[in-house]
Amino acid sequence: MTQINSQYRLRSSAFERSEEEKLVEPKKVVFLSVEGDETERTYFTHLSETLDSSIIHIEVLRHRRGDGYSDPIYVIELLQEFLDMRQGPLIPNEILNEIIAKYSDETIQTYLATPDKLDHRLKNNIQSDLLLLGIDVEYRRYLQKYDKATDIFGVVLDRDCGSHSREAMEASVKYCQEKGFHCYVSNPCFEFWLLLHLCDVMTEFEDEERRQLLLNPTISAHHTQVSFEVSKRAHHRKRISQAVFMAKYYPNIEMAIRRSQNFALHFPELFDNLGTNIPELLEEIKFPTA
């Protein structure tokens, strides 16, 4: 079976069945499709770990490694793919027909219902062929376990005026609003939200320095202006370790929310000004503040 340029992107290289077995089903799940595969994902994953898992869980949707997700359209499409999968079959019909043609209907139905009844090699072959077609069955099975009317669906986007036009961002936000998705945007980028945990941007930066934060030029092989300011205070690059999250970010979330009040918080102001509406997400999950 040859690999195809699949429209299906939901994929987790980190998924382990042991995690599924230990799962405590929460009353509400926040499903997030995020632009960055490291910074946003690790931040929200660590944040979720601090919450009462019987009440709420943040699930950051995973995509195929190597997929480009710097475009808001792709971020939104990943969330839409998840919702289509949640409301439909585990394997899309066009993929199901192709895999049945190779293995037989009986074999595939057994694989879907009681996979452990199949020969180990046969099961692995089916799984590998599905992955080639863009279908990570185990991850999809894991995601389908969450299905509450109270669940929240959102995208986390960077304004990034150097890459995304205002018109494209306006269209993305409008689409999300029409679909009932929450749209969390930081201008210029998610790292601005991180910076609010680490310092008082309004008092520590002069007007011209804040303008440079908004423009967010690339200043080295590893950093833009904002990511550099984050790195020199928190001492990490893209991936946030749990130790760094607990030391630098978690204790300062309430402070970051307060500091965000000095900047743009809502649309349309967020399109053109330094700011973030990530505090809306913290309000949705009822993050404890004084």
Question: Would you name each region that the model predicts?
Answer:
Residues 1-28, 39-41, 45-64, 87-290:
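C-terminal accessory helical subdomains adjacent to catalytic cores in phosphodiester-
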Residues 68-81, 126:
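Charged, often glycine-rich, active-site loop that binds/positions anionic groups
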Residues 30-35:
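Short, hydrophobic/glycine-enriched beta-strand segments
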